[in-house]
């Protein structure tokens, strides 16, 4: 039996495997689901064994959440492919009523598979294991060696991952990296991501007094920290121009003419973007004038206020608030320096504070951008595999998000090519209510990865770069 035939005959089993994974509430963001994280790692190991992987184990480093690991090293002389996915997910708290079906019950509807983690990133676990099983259950061997790692703390920043890689370098060393944690620009259009934005996150705290004061006594006299904070944050408003942060564009790498033309061909027109992101009628897209959405989200810096707090609804009172805070996330692009960008934003936020309030700005997280040249033997192999799996030639795209380990891991592996293959699409709603995975693309990606093993295994002299 051919691997493709095996995938067709075992489609229901693969969907069932995904259903089992989605059913485990492996939420890593709140510290209250450690048992579920452990259970999900164990379940992933069980699925690895069923697919035919060897040396399967739950691994940890320090106080990390569990990793699931398995390997098959029965192809001497052939390249080794490192597969990455993650089994932890985002919570649904506060948005349960917006789900049209139970978030932790995989539900097929309108050609899509709904459930928390279906797209991000449990679907990737099943596509990778399905591709592995399609060979090991039919040919009893793979065209390449495979090492597979499924992480348990991606959704909380992967703080232990780099240390885990260094600690287990010899065990993990591979020739090609394959990550399925990015998106496709459209349903049915396979995409290879060759750039990722980085991130600079910071906290701003504004203080005006040592204690709250009754607004009847001090309202109109005492500086309101919440208003002062919002006056400061308003300095970041860009309208339809560039970000009003001096120096922030100085090192931004310009798009080539080829990139600009390619980006404008992908992803549709404004009505599609508005529909995909649920933009309300009458609300403008906040684009810089004459900049295409793909260019804006893939290769331009952006600034977002992700948390703002001064009090709570439950604790509301007629007081002048003495303290307010916000967290700001800035996405950075090639060739920006995270430390420089932090200082540039800090300078804007701390200059001439309203009413002379005390302003403190501190860094909370930084992650470098990543970019590679999407050519060379491994990228040719991926292009062929995706074209065979999807029936459409793939396109090369950027990603507005961040996957911080890709660059350091490629470097640790001696400059290994990193293939970032899309599993999500514009309406997957990762992290949001009604997260879903397109069932057809799920099957096509599984077939593509199966074929990718063959394409890499057939590279002349095993040269992957």
Please report, for each region that a protein language model flagged, where it lies by residue:
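Polar, glycine-rich mid-to-C-terminal structural blocks
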Residues: 202, 209, 213-275
């Amino acid at each position: 039996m051919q691997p493709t035939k095996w995938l067709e005959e075992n489609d229901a089993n693969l969907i069932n495997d995904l259903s089992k994974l989605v059913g485990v509430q492996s939420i890593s963001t709140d510290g209250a689901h450690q048992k579920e994280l452990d259970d999900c790692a164990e379940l992933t190991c069980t699925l690895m064994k069923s697919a035919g992987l060897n040396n399967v184990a739950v691994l940890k480093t320090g106080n990390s959440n569990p990793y699931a690991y398995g390997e098959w090293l029965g192809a001497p002389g052939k390249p080794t492919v490192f597969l990455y996915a993650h089994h932890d997910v985002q919570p649904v708290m506060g948005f349960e009523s917006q789900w049209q079906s139970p978030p932790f019950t995989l539900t097929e509807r309108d050609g899509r598979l709904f459930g928390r983690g279906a797209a991000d990133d449990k679907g990737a676990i099943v596509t990778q294991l399905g591709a592995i099983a399609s060979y090991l259950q039919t040919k009893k061997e793979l065209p390449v060696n495979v090492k597979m790692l499924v992480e348990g703390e991606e959704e909380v920043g992967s703080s232990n991952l780099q240390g885990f890689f260094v600690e287990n370098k010899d065990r993990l060393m591979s020739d090609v990296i394959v990550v399925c944690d990015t998106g496709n620009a459209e349903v049915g259009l396979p995409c290879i991501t060759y750039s990722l934005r980085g991130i600079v996150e910071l906290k701003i705290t504004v203080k005006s007094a040592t204690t709250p004061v009754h607004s009847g006594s001090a309202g109109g006299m005492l500086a309101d920290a919440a208003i002062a904070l919002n006056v400061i944050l308003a300095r970041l408003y860009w309208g339809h121009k560039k970000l009003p942060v001096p120096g922030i564009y100085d090192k931004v790498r310009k798009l080539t003419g080829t990139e600009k033309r390619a980006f404008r061909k992908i992803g549709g027109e404004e009505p599609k973007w508005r529909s995909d992101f649920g933009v309300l009628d009458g609300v403008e897209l906040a684009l810089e004038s004459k900049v295409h959405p793909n260019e804006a989200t893939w290769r331009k810096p952006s600034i977002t206020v992700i948390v703002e707090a001064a009090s709570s609804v439950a604790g509301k009172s007629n007081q002048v608030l003495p303290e307010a805070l916000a967290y700001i996330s800035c996405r950075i692009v090639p060739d920006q320096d995270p430390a420089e960008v932090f200082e540039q934003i800090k300078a804007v936020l701390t200059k001439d504070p309203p009413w002379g309030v005390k302003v403190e700005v501190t860094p909370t997280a930084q992650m470098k951008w990543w970019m590679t040249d999407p050519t060379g033997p491994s990228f040719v192999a991926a292009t062929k595999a995706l074209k065979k799996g999807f029936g459409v030639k793939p396109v090369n795209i950027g990603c507005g998000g961040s996957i911080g380990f890709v660059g350091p891991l490629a470097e640790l592996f001696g400059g290994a090519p990193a293939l970032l293959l899309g599993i999500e699409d514009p309406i997957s709603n990762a992290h949001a209510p009604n997260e879903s995975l397109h069932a057809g693309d799920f099957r096509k990606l599984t077939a593509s990865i199966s074929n990718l093993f063959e394409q890499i295994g057939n590279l002349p002299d095993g040269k992957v770069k």
